[in-house]
Amino acid sequence: VLGQRPGPSTGLPTYTSQTELNFALSAGQGEFTRFIAAPSDAEDSYYWAAVSLNISKKFRIPSILLTDKTICEGLFNFDIDSIREIKSEAAQVPAFPPDKGIMVKANSYEHDVSGITTEDPVKTVQMQNNRLMKTKLLAEELEKYETVKCFCNGKPDTAIICWGSNRPACEEIGKSLGLKVVCPMVISPFPIDAFKTALKGIKRIISIENNATGQLGALINSYGIKVNDQILKYDGRPFSVDELEAAVKSKL
């Protein structure tokens, strides 16, 4: 769980932000598949935490629940019985010491499929390709989940893009101003097909984030989707509905 607050260094440790999306996407040595979910409230957090654990077990990859202090220390209520069951789908049950009759190997060095250290160039390429293949398989797996949430009335031509704890306030603004609200639940692998489907008929995009550089907006731009305007807040405080409504109106 990565609960974001303002930095750098100690920063504002008791306030909130959305400043570590890029860090979550790139932290670590080398190139490998990772799963990142960005819940927008307690119900999402409960659900995607279970999905994250399942995906890590099934694909043997790290999962990050990218949240923020607003959610981490917020008070929510929801019907826990409404959350559909997430069944474990681990391909294999990992072995743990001191299980009898097995050998447990954990090797951070490059290794072959048997876990034996190797520096062979052919095997190195094969193992790297195997790791990267998980990205495609994971993207296919995620098609059965609601990886992008949408909220709208009618057929608006302007959309608000948000993520994390900004979603509830954006949804309220969307209803009052007649805008579509699009909120990705998954950051990596980014659900670009579902995201493009959500933006059908949209001519103008406004990105709303709690950071200074528009990190989600930059990620969206990298997929060839133009973000027309940004509303960025980075004083450590979450958006209030009133200030956000005024900011959105100024962009329309």
How would you describe each model-predicted region?
Residues 4-13, 31-38, 228-233:
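Short beta-alpha connecting loops at secondary-structure transitions
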Residues 8, 17-20, 144:
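Glycine-rich, flexible loop/turn motifs
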Residues 15-68:
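Conserved thiamine diphosphate
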Residues 53-252:
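Flexible, low-complexity linker and terminal segments
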Residues 9-14, 38-42, 132-137, 180-183:
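Short linear motifs at secondary-structure transitions and domain/linker junctions
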Residues 1-5, 88-91:
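A glycine-rich helix N-cap at a beta->alpha junction
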Residues 2-10, 41-43, 69-71, 185-188:
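Acidic, glycine-rich active-site loops and adjacent beta-strand->loop/helix elements
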Residues 11-12, 20, 27-30, 95-100, ...:
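Glycine-centered flexibility motif
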